[in-house]
């Protein structure tokens, strides 16, 4: 078959690796920062949860349908090209969504200093206590772009002078801001000058601005950094059109972009399966993670240093979508050489139905499905609101991107120890260890105290994400019938994990609104620990039936060169069955 250029396997693998690398960079441009951008627009936490939950739900239901259509009508190349091209255009629609305050501009791009574009929600009334400071004011937190100490030492004495100085500072520190009925309004019902205590008090200051990380609900000492006062408010009373338009754009965008990965994976798998080389595509996920790691740091650095130069007006973060569109165009060029099998007329496949039937008939798979569901619910809360939490503590986008890259690189570096870890601890042991590390990780997120404090715990992602999914994959391979491993894996990652992500987003937004982000992560920790205890108590009581994977046995038999050995010790079938028994016993 080598003369046929359609089956050039080395070339196909090189193109597939490059495609996964570019797609990883593409996803990293927007996916980690989407909820942070929605916060910049003024969308409240529960609405962000609804939006992200809808996004996950669409992906869960829409991807299998598109994959079926692409295979049934042999239109995979069309799906790949159409998804990349249309999603590149759809991403730019997000730039057109207006913020809650239509007068919002990039106020931090004033040439000399940076001031937050995300500020108080519409109609928030707050009492402000200003304490004089020495020098030019408290310094900014390292890496922070949205906190700034307010220097009141230059304000004149007297009530009228104090209010005038306050108004001049708040308006003047935001270069080019407009003081209109939709912009900044300072309404005072009382002003007191306490010169003996050195404190100026402004009563009932109403700031009609956008939601952000300024502490609400009580007196605030503005001589301190913003993140040190109270829990930020995550509600918004602005126009619902921002949410409605954002929801419409995200739904449309997801319908176009979601099928890409599944259609590409199916195409490559069938291409390699025709020449019995499917085992050679198992390292492609490494290239995807490398792309995400590089992309998330690159886009964060780009936003931090070039956005003021490239985007003068509009909310902070629009460059995410321009970058996504640009990288999608690059991926479109690579996709023209992506391996797609042709003239493979096959009958209808019912592997999804068979996979559901297999799960329903095996209690161990049912338990594993619930485990993956809770993993998805927890992961979505981290994806949706961890960057909010970091932003409230002064983290910049570069620190956020580095935290994501650190966790992904840890998974890649830890992968060579996969086999030894699964052999020493067994699949059940690694699952329990992964759930415990995930619970510890989200509990740590609830108590972060500084802009850098989230970085050390990211090393736990090697276990809470990497090893946990290795154990899930190994369990699926051992519990599935021959030829059903891939269908089961797709169902677990697509349906059960996606459904958990959807539920976590829906519930997480309302928990953040009423209790705060820290309470959300504490609740996730409690749920994971309860499920871990239930999992470890139920697992030993389930029937431990041995299911021989004949494809694995044949692979072992083909590589066994000791057929001439005497006795059962030289029998490859006996060796495989003993290893299978020892794994389940462990």
Curated annotation (Swiss-Prot):
It comes from Mus musculus. It is a multi-pass membrane protein. Keywords: Membrane, Transmembrane, Transmembrane helix. PANTHER family: MAJOR FACILITATOR SUPERFAMILY DOMAIN-CONTAINING PROTEIN 6-LIKE. The chain crosses the membrane at residues 50-70, 78-98, 240-260, 284-304, 318-338, 365-385, 397-417, 428-448, 454-474, 494-514, 519-538. This is Major facilitator superfamily domain-containing protein 6-like. SUPFAM superfamilies: MFS general substrate transporter. Residues 218-237 are annotated as: Disordered. GO terms for cellular component: membrane. Belongs to the major facilitator superfamily. MFSD6 family. Signal peptide: none annotated. The keyword Metal-binding does not apply.
